[in-house]
């Protein structure tokens, strides 16, 4: 689904789209395989780094292959970890990362990532932790509104009890409340809109 493609043609269209504006824009390519060939194609197409996403497979081989390739070519890797812990726990993911530099998306966890403890990835020397903004700023209605947002953004069915349980499992008041303070402390130094997923840029900025 719409979490990105990295073909040379698609990247060319994306780069051309930004040509009319005096902006420096970096495009992340999809990292969803266990071999280098798709990464090589995307890098040749002009990506500035790669995004590993749980919806297309944040598996051990994918993480290791992408980080190894990125280190070789000095490009960035953003990681949206395995929210259902189907392949890896947060401890397993940290072991695969093995001290290499990575940008951890959705580190609070409501937008995705290892449940319930992805927040433990924040504050590590090799990990640039970031929030996406559905949980910022934290207000009195934040927890209540997120089940519907998760279901909508991820194509779930609100009539299926299993989908509702999965959505509710991501909503944790304590980590939502802690997130703002962790930003103030610099433990989570980055935020972004996630505007095409669980995002609401107009509420945060």
PLM feature segments, named:
Residues 37-41, 91:
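Catalytic cores of alpha/beta
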Residues 1-14, 88-89:
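Metal-associated gating/positioning segment near the N- to mid-region
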Residues 34-38, 62:
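Short acidic active-site motifs
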């Amino acid at each position: 689904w719409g979490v990105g493609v990295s073909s040379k043609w698609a990247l060319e269209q994306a780069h051309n789209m930004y040509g009319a504006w005096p902006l420096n824009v970096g495009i992340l390519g999809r990292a969803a395989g266990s071999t280098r060939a798709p990464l090589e194609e995307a890098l040749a197409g002009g990506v500035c780094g790669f995004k590993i996403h749980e919806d297309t497979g944040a598996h051990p081989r994918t993480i290791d292959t992408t980080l190894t390739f990125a280190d070789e070519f000095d490009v960035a890797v953003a990681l949206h970890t395995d929210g259902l812990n189907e392949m890896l726990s947060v401890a397993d993911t940290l072991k695969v990362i093995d001290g290499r530099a990575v940008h951890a998306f959705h580190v609070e966890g409501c937008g995705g990532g290892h449940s319930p403890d992805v927040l433990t990835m924040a504050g590590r020397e090799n990990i640039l932790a970031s929030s996406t903004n559905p949980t910022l700023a934290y207000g009195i209605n934040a927890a209540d509104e997120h089940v519907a947002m998760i279901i909508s953004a991820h194509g779930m069915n609100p009539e299926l009890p299993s989908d509702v349980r999965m959505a509710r499992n991501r909503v944790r008041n304590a980590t939502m409340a802690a997130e703002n303070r962790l930003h103030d402390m610099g433990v989570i130094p980055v935020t972004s809109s996630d505007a095409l997923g669980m995002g609401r840029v107009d509420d945060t900025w």
